[in-house]
């Protein structure tokens, strides 16, 4: 018979800091590999007053590549959300519902950073990805099936300090 095993997904990384998150290394929730199907990326959820990084920083929820099997697909990408300057009410709603509405959505900027050409350099140095796994092996009807890309969101609230509104 034909015996394969599915690989585990990437799991979840959640860091909530009251101050600055300094990441000069690697945070990953990458899908695993098995003898058959390859795992999807997991989830990374980082919240703090700021996020600092370096050229060596890697934040990845990528799906696992298929480089070993002729009969299985690569894992899909996971989800990454990095949140800066959110207040307690905004964080509570985001944790509970996964979105911000009403007064909690006021003065919020959400940048969609999906895909290889995303402008991540506005926010950080290094690599930020939730790409789908690459499929070097499986060809069906002349097409290679890779994992779908995941999502990357950079969510910013109002920075603390003096706010002057002139009318």
Report residues per predicted region.
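Glycine-centered low-complexity coil/loop motifs and glycine-rich tracts
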Residues: 1-14, 22-47, 54-85, 92-156
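Enriched but not universal
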Residues: 153, 158-167
């Amino acid at each position: 018979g034909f015996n394969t095993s599915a690989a585990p997904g990437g799991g979840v990384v959640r860091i909530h800091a009251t101050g600055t998150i300094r990441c000069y290394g690697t945070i990953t929730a990458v899908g695993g590999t098995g003898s058959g199907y390859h795992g999807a990326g997991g989830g990374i959820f980082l919240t703090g007053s700021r996020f600092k990084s370096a050229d060596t920083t890697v934040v990845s929820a990528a799906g696992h590549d298929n480089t070993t099997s002729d009969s299985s697909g690569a894992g899909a990408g996971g989800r990454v959300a990095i949140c800066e300057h959110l207040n307690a009410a905004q964080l509570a709603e985001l944790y509970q519902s996964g979105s911000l509405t009403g007064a909690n959505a006021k003065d919020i900027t959400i940048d969609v950073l999906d895909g290889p050409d995303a402008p991540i350099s506005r926010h950080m140095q290094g690599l930020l990805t939730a790409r789908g796994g690459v499929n070097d092996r499986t060809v069906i009807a002349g097409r290679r099936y890779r994992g779908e890309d995941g999502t990357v969101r950079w969510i910013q609230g109002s920075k603390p300090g003096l706010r002057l509104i002139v009318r």
